[in-house]
């Protein structure tokens, strides 16, 4: 049985994206290795305290950036955090800008996702006898996004609050035709990881908001060099430093009790009659379904 490893105070999770493989300012840091019913998460988690709050940090692509977007075990990552009683997630990622107004090193806080992936199997915890359909009309926690917007702007960063993040598979970047199409469709930024995390966090009743750091203009600006891994390295390093400055101020403002709408996302999502739930599936999902057992 995969019971919760932290039945104390609700914790905060930070998922680090490209260029962000550590988090500064953690008191009493220690590494935690977790096995989940879905396999291993991307890497060991780092546990520590910031502003007297329990925080867990997970590098999405593993330290040393060893995992492609399509190789990520999103279920294991989110399940591992939920098993540690994480109820809020700050998800950090690099994105390409599809609009002139979003410049490299700007921060975009997406309010919507458009999922164009085709290689992300298993973006749900449910099945095997228990059916649930969570609402994703608003996939981002408005409350957490508002905190991040206020604190990041207060630190002097250029913040764009709201926007549509289109999620592609990768690992190759877009063609010019694709990039221009995405622009004309009205999408704001493009990335490779955000949508799956938002879906699974909602099923796990975790409030999630995404900090998307702009590194490039994708390839729609014909007067600029098209995006490449080498051209974005400097922006990645600057963005990682910015993220480390933002975390403490945001974490300090997150409430102590998980009472936002996302924390009760399963109230009207579970379809299968409780009497019909298979015991094996219940054991597997105990961390997520604890309120209903």
Where would I find each of the regions flagged by the language model?
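Metabolite-binding pocket within alpha/beta catalytic cores that recognizes anionic/polar moieties
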Residues: 2-137, 292-293
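Non-catalytic positions within long, well-ordered alpha-helices that form the structural scaffold/packing
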Residues: 82-85, 183, 202
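Short acidic/polar active-site loop segments enriched in Thr and Asp
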Residues: 87-88, 188, 207
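Generic non-transmembrane alpha-helical segments
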Residues: 143, 147-158, 245-253
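Active-site/ligand-binding-proximal alpha/beta "capping" segment
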Residues: 154-188
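Zn-dependent metallopeptidase/amidohydrolase metal-coordination segment
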Residues: 192-230
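His/Asp/Glu-rich mid-to-C-terminal helical/loop segments that flank catalytic regions of hydrolases
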Residues: 219-266
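A short, charged, Gly/Pro-tolerant segment at domain boundaries
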Residues: 259-293
């Amino acid at each position: 049985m995969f019971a919760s490893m932290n039945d104390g105070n609700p914790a905060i999770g930070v998922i680090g994206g490209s260029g962000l493989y550590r988090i500064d300012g953690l008191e009493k840091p220690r590494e935690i290795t977790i096995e989940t019913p879905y396999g291993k998460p991307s890497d060991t988690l780092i546990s520590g305290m910031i502003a007297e709050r329990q925080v867990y940090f997970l590098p999405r692509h593993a330290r040393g950036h060893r995992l492609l977007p399509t190789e990520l075990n999103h279920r294991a990552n989110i399940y591992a955090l939920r098993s540690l009683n994480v109820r809020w997630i700050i998800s950090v990622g690099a994105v390409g800008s599809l609009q002139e107004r979003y410049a490299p090193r700007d921060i975009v806080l997406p309010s919507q996702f458009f999922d164009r992936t085709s290689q992300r199997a298993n973006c749900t915890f449910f099945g095997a006898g228990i059916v649930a359909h969570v609402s994703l009309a608003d996939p981002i926690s408005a409350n957490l996004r508002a905190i991040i917007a206020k604190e990041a702007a207060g630190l002097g960063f250029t913040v764009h609050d709201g926007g549509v993040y289109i999620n592609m598979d990768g690992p190759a970047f877009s063609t010019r035709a694709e990039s221009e199409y995405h622009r004309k469709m009205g999408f704001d930024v493009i990335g490779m990881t955000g949508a799956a995390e938002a879906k699974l966090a909602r099923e796990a009743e975790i409030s999630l908001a995404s900090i998307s750091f702009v590194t490039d203009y994708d390839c729609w600006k014909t007067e600029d060099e098209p995006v490449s891994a080498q051209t974005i390295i400097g922006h990645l390093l600057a963005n990682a430093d910015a993220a480390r400055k933002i975390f403490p101020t945001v974490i300090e403002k997150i409430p102590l009790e998980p009472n936002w709408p996302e924390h009760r996302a399963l109230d009207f999502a579970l379809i299968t009659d409780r009497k019909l739930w298979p015991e094996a599936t219940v054991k597997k999902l105990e961390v997520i379904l604890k309120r209903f057992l």
